Structures are given as structure tokens and as C-alpha cells.
């Protein structure tokens, strides 16, 4: 009969007893009992979010940082405090106390050497998750993650990865690998003459780049020097390629970019100021935004020659009868057309027929004479006359002839229909109709039958006789009579 061998359960690193599946907790590849899964220093219960395993021992993040993290100014308990923790609470079992450097920082502990190319690039030891810092895809100890020159502590913001596979702070990186010369050392504006050790013991001298040394074919190179422009140094302007060194103002030699570059008529580039002085408008109020007279040594003949004036003749191309501009009769093209009352006008001709003020779709008024006018001229020519009309409440003295075509406010011609206006009998069109008790009226006929007051939907009253009245006349004709019912309360009407 075969013997039965039970599967051996894994052992807990804390107590050394077997751990079964119902009570196991995992950390760092080891299995712990649920009761043993707590910090080895402060005995705090742990979970998967706050536990840290180090050499088969469990710690909370705080205790792990205090025991294995860096020591010194800014690292103890919280940033910005001086930690005097010398590790005395971490005495070994034999009572040995680790030596202390400068009274605060622990001596480097013995670190196991990692295989070549896998450990910390500075010390070569294993890097655990609690203390690793990443740079150039490699893991560093937090203690080793400092500038290779000034030994300043670094982080992900201050770290600069150098071509020599080391890390530096920004200042040391700029001094060692950045550009040299006036304006580059220590933030610009200072002459830097630092000499760094080279193979020959002398500083490197950077030769000036001669961009026109390699000439391009005519019409293909840089417009300023004629040299070939490569992709690493090209600047584009108006479809042409420039060297970055040559892309400056032709007059003041100010360095340009895509924002302040202006293409001149001479196919060169200028800054905005020089472009405005040379090609912009001249006169009072135009000089770079200042309110003074700018001459800049230019005569009126030179200014006129640079800015020729062209007055187009709109009558040179005649249109067919009834199709051209109503004012000049010339053909109107799409780029210059203005629309008014179904007619097409030239933009130049679209002005008031009397005062010649330029018009637009807001100011234009179509007159009965087939022409267009501004509002003021339209009111003077075709508007009502008399006291209170016109531009001011003044009495207008004219020839004495009335300008109103229909003095009684009623149409004089047209077909009379049975369903027309109840007052005049003529047909009522949609543009002028007013509705009252299922009957349609002209707008001019829509007034009180007694006092001739104009009516609307708010003061309209339909009388029993089929006519319309205002409220006062309706009450006077059809309302109750007696004390308190007249035009006002408490008045006796004798109708």
C-alpha cells in the first residue's frame, strides 16, 4: 500500500511555522501569517498598501524610511528639519552601536554587490524598491543620486543626464557641457572663462560657422548669403528658406522669429518697427503708434511713389440694360457688389445720392425715386413734414403743399371685395392687415370710430354695431349709465 506524503506548507519568516492558504499574507515573495503581518519596529498592523519587505522582515513605510532611508538635514521625520537620529534605537543584538559621521548621519552600511550593469551606477550595489531613484533607465540609491561634481542632492526636476553616463545638477551640467562664451555662464550676462580639463589641457575653442561656405544653386539657397540651408538650421519666411543666423532684420539686425518677422516688398525680412518706418503709412499718428509727425527723410514724391493711388473706373465695362449698377451703369463683379432692394451696386457707388455719405446695410434707405439715401436725407426728402418731425422739434416751412399721398389715410384705388376692410371696403393684404373679432382691417383704418384714436390689441373694443372703439368711447356708448359709471367713478352721466 503506497504511503501518503502531505504537501509541505511554506514557513512564515516571522515565527517559522507553517502558513496555510486561509491565513496567508504575501509580501516580497514571502508568505506570512495574518497575525505576523505587522511592522517589526512599531508592531503596527500592515496591509498591501503600507507594507515594505526588507531582508525577510516587514516594516511600515515610516519605520523603513527611518531605518534604511537617508539621514541628514531635510530627511528626518519631515522635510525641513534637522534629524539628530543616530540610529541608537536600532542596536544590534550584541550591543554594538554603528559609528556616526558628523553626529547625525550613519556610516554607509555594507551593501551586497550586484551583477555588472544591474546595480547602482555609482556604487554598484543592489538597489531595493524603497530607496531607488530612476535616471537614464537605471536604478540609483537615494544616497548616490546626487550631482557628480558638487554632490548636491538631486530629484527628477533638478537631474540632468550627461553624455558621460553620469548625473549632474543644472548648474554643473551647463558649465561642463553647455555652450561657452559671453552671455552663457551662470544665467547670461556674465563672461565665463572657466577652463575645464581636456586632453590637451586647454579649453575648447568653437570656430564660427561660415554658412555661405557651401553655395547653393541660384534661387535655392538662403536669400541673404546664398548658402545651402539644411533642415537643422532652416527658418521659413514667405516660402523661402533662411539660415537661422541670417534670419534677422535687414536694417537693425535684430534676431527675428515667426511672430515679429515682416516680409518686405523687396523680398527681404524686417522687424515690425523697421517695416513700419520703411513701408508703413507716414504722417501724423502713424509712427510706431506715437502721435507725432514722422518724416524719416522721405519726401512727398518718394512716399507717393512707394504708395501709388488707384481710382478704378467702374463705367469702363458697361452692362446690359437693367443689369448693371443703378448709379453708373457699369458691370458689377462679385468682389465689389452691394445689394439693395434687389439691385446690385458697386461698393464705390453705394453712397447717399444727396450727401454722398458711404452706406451699408444698416444705414441705407431705398427711396421711391429708385435711388438710395442715408437716413437723414431720406427723412428730409420723403418723411412727414410739420411740427415735431425732422431732426428737431421745429416747424418746417415748405411751399405749403402736403407731402402726404393719402390725407385721409385710406386707399383711393383697388378692387372692393365683400371680405375686404369693413371701413373702406378695399382688399386687405397680409403686410397691412389688423385682425379684430374675425374681421380684417387695414392698419390705417384700424382706429376708434368716434375719436379716431389709433388702436392696437391692448386697447381694442369690438362694439355691438360691428365697429371698433377705444375703451373710453366704448364705455361711453355701450357701458352702464348712472352714478359712478361715467368717465370716472362718482360722476353722473346724462347720456
UniProtKB/Swiss-Prot annotation:
Residue ranges annotated as motif Nuclear localization signal: 66-71, 175-180
InterPro entries (UniProt xref): Znf_LIM
One annotated GO molecular function: metal ion binding
Tissue expression: In the embryo, expression is restricted to the somatic, visceral, and pharyngeal muscles. Within the somatic musculature, expression is localized at the ends of muscles fibers at the point of attachment to the epidermis (at protein level). There is no expression in cardiac mesoderm or in fat body.
Keywords: Cytoplasm, Developmental protein, Differentiation, LIM domain, Metal-binding, Myogenesis, Nucleus, Repeat, Zinc
Keyword Cytoplasm belongs to the record: yes
Membrane-spanning parts: none
Positions of the LIM zinc-binding domain: 12-63, 120-172, 222-274, 325-377, 421-473
Subcellular location: Cytoplasm; Nucleus
Recorded GO CC terms: cytoplasm; nucleus; Z disc
Database matches in SUPFAM superfamilies: Glucocorticoid receptor-like (DNA-binding domain)
Keyword Ribosomal protein attributed: no
The protein's name: Muscle LIM protein Mlp84B
Amino acid at each position: 500500500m503506497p504511503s501518503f506524503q502531505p504537501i509541505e506548507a511554506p514557513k512564515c519568516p516571522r515565527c517559522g511555522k507553517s502558513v496555510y492558504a486561509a491565513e496567508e499574507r504575501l509580501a516580497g515573495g514571502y508568505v506570512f501569517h495574518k497575525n505576523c503581518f505587522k511592522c517589526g519596529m512599531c508592531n503596527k498592523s500592515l496591509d498591501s498598501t503600507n507594507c515594505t519587505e526588507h531582508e525577510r522582515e516587514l516594516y511600515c513605510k515610516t519605520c523603513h524610511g527611518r531605518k534604511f532611508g537617508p539621514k541628514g538635514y531635510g530627511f528626518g521625520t519631515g522635510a525641513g528639519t534637522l534629524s539628530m537620529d543616530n540610529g541608537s534605537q536600532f542596536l544590534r543584538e550584541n550591543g554594538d552601536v554603528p559609528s556616526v559621521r558628523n553626529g547625525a548621519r550613519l556610516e554607509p552600511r555594507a551593501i551586497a554587490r550586484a551583477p555588472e550593469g544591474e546595480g547602482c551606477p555609482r556604487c554598484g550595489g543592489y538597489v531595493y524598491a524603497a530607496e531607488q531613484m530612476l535616471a537614464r533607465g537605471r536604478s540609483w540609491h537615494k544616497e548616490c543620486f546626487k550631482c557628480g561634481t558638487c554632490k548636491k542632492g538631486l530629484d527628477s526636476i533638478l537631474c540632468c543626464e550627461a553624455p558621460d553616463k553620469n548625473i549632474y545638477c543644472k548648474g554643473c551640467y551647463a558649465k561642463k557641457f553647455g555652450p561657452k562664451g559671453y552671455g552663457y555662464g551662470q544665467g547670461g550676462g556674465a563672461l565665463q572663462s572657466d577652463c575645464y580639463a581636456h586632453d590637451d589641457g586647454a579649453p575648447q575653442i568653437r570656430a564660427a560657422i561660415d554658412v555661405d561656405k557651401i553655395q547653393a544653386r541660384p534661387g535655392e539657397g538662403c536669400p541673404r548669403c546664398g548658402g545651402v540651408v539644411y533642415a537643422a538650421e532652416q527658418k521659413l519666411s514667405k516660402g523661402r528658406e533662411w539660415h537661422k543666423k541670417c534670419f534677422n532684420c535687414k536694417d537693425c539686425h535684430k534676431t527675428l522669429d515667426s511672430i515679429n518677422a515682416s516680409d518686405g516688398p523687396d523680398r527681404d525680412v524686417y522687424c515690425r518697427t523697421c517695416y513700419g518706418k520703411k513701408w508703413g503709412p507716414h504722417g501724423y499718428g502713424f509712427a510706431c503708434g506715437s502721435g507725432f509727425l514722422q518724416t524719416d527723410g522721405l519726401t512727398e514724391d518718394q512716399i507717393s511713389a512707394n504708395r501709388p493711388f488707384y481710382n478704378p473706373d467702374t463705367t469702363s465695362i458697361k452692362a446690359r440694360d437693367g443689369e448693371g449698377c443703378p448709379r453708373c451703369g457699369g458691370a458689377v463683379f462679385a468682389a465689389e457688389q452691394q445689394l439693395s432692394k434687389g439691385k446690385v451696386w458697386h461698393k464705390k457707388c453705394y453712397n447717399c445720392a444727396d450727401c454722398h455719405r458711404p452706406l451699408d446695410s444698416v444705414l441705407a434707405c431705398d427711396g421711391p425715386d429708385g435711388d438710395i439715401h442715408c437716413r437723414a436725407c431720406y427723412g428730409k426728402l420723403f418723411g412727414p413734414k410739420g411740427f415735431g418731425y425732422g431732426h428737431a422739434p421745429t416747424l418746417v416751412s415748405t411751399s405749403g403743399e402736403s407731402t402726404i399721398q393719402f390725407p385721409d389715410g385710406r386707399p383711393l384705388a383697388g378692387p372692393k371685395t365683400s371680405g375686404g376692410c369693413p371701413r373702406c371696403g378695399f382688399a386687405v393684404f397680409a403686410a397691412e392687415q389688423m385682425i379684430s373679432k374675425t374681421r380684417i382691417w387695414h392698419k390705417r383704418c384700424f382706429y376708434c370710430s368716434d375719436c379716431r384714436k389709433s388702436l392696437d390689441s391692448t386697447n381694442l373694443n369690438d362694439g355691438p354695431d360691428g365697429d371698433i372703439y377705444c375703451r373710453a368711447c366704448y364705455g361711453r356708448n355701450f357701458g352702464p349709465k348712472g352714478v359712478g359709471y361715467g368717465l370716472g367713478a362718482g360722476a353722473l352721466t346724462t347720456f
